[in-house]
Design a protein with these regions (language model features):
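A boundary/linker detector
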Residues: 1-7, 24-29, 72-101
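Short cysteine-rich loop/turn motifs with clustered Cys
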Residues: 4-34, 58-60
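Amphipathic alpha-helical interaction segments
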Residues: 13, 45, 96-99
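Intrinsic disorder/low-complexity detector
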Residues: 18, 39, 65-72, 99-101
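Short Cys/His-centered divalent metal-binding micro-motifs
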Residues: 25-28, 32, 54-77
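Short linker/helix segments within small regulatory modules
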Residues: 39-54
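Glycine-rich loops and low-complexity Gly/Arg-rich segments
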Residues: 46, 58-61, 81-84
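Short C-terminal domain-edge/linker segments immediately following a structured domain
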Residues: 52-53, 64-67, 86-92
């Protein structure tokens, strides 16, 4: 784990008040222990330190995001990716000045 990742992880946990953001959706309070890459690091390493691609989760919810047999996103993981689809598309295909006219 790089020094940049360690620093970024701390910033994301602070941003999310050290609370699991998935549990919070269900009005539960659980301490986040993991910072999850919404679009997986293995597939998109350039997104590894991008804030919108990171979310604080408890270990139980983090395990619900990954299929542990083949490390693909689960249904829950895919739904999280869908929520960030606009940010992902803007990263993948940045708008140009030409697009604004």
């Amino acid at each position: 784990k790089s020094p940049k990742w360690i620093a970024k992880r701390g910033r994301i946990l602070r941003r999310d008040s050290y609370e699991c953001q998935n549990c919070k959706r269900y009005f539960k309070t659980k301490t986040a222990t993991t910072v999850h890459h919404i679009y997986f690091y293995e597939d998109y390493p350039k997104l590894s330190l991008v804030s919108w691609n990171l979310i604080s989760l408890c270990s139980e919810c983090h395990n619900k995001m990954h299929n542990r047999f083949d490390d693909t996103p689960t249904k829950l993981g895919i739904s999280l990716q869908e929520k960030k689809k606009k940010e992902f598309e803007n990263w993948l295909y940045p708008p140009t000045n030409r697009d604004k006219n």
